[in-house]
A protein has these predicted regions:
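Radical SAM enzyme core and accessory elements
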Residues: 94, 104-136
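Conserved AdoMet/S-adenosylmethionine-binding subsite of the radical SAM
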Residues: 1-95
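A structural preference for short, hydrophobic beta-strand core positions in alpha/beta folds
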Residues: 66, 101-103
Length: 136
């Protein structure tokens, strides 16, 4: 349910189908998979999510890269504090998961992961509106 809230595409491509595809890829290529996990404060930073992610990581024998959420205008989600990120990372590590936290750059200028896309879309929409107004 949390995954569907964060990623509406989960309705079209459920997690189980994604995991099966990852397993097929691993068998075919014999390569390690990295799972990217975005941490959103008070949404998916609890112990229930730790346990679910441990199960997924052990099933895939993958590495997990934690990505603290970058605030995006128009969304109410919040970035977790450093202590929450560290606690989540440590909980995974103590359960045998190979885990890293993404080093980020650009958050302070709205240029980090997720932020640039919104800016690009807003700029394109504004340009389209400007052209429509000129042509009217």
């Amino acid at each position: 349910e949390v995954r569907s809230q964060i990623m509406p595409i989960n309705r079209k491509y459920p997690l189980e189908a994604l995991l099966s595809a990852c397993e097929a890829y691993q068998q075919a290529k014999g390569r390690m998979i990295w799972v990217e996990y975005i941490l959103i404060d008070e949404i998916n930073t609890g112990m229930d999510q730790v346990e679910a992610l441990v199960g997924l990581a052990k099933r895939l024998q993958c590495k997990v890269n934690l990505i603290p959420y970058n605030p995006v205008g128009g969304l109410e989600w919040k970035r977790p504090c450093g202590e929450t990120v560290s606690s989540f990372r440590d909980a995974l590590h103590h359960r045998g998961v190979r885990v890293t936290v993404r080093t980020e750059k650009g958050t302070d200028i709205d240029a980090a992961c997720g932020q640039l896309r919104l800016k690009t879309e807003q700029t394109a929409a504004n340009q389209a509106l400007g052209q429509a107004a000129e042509n009217a």
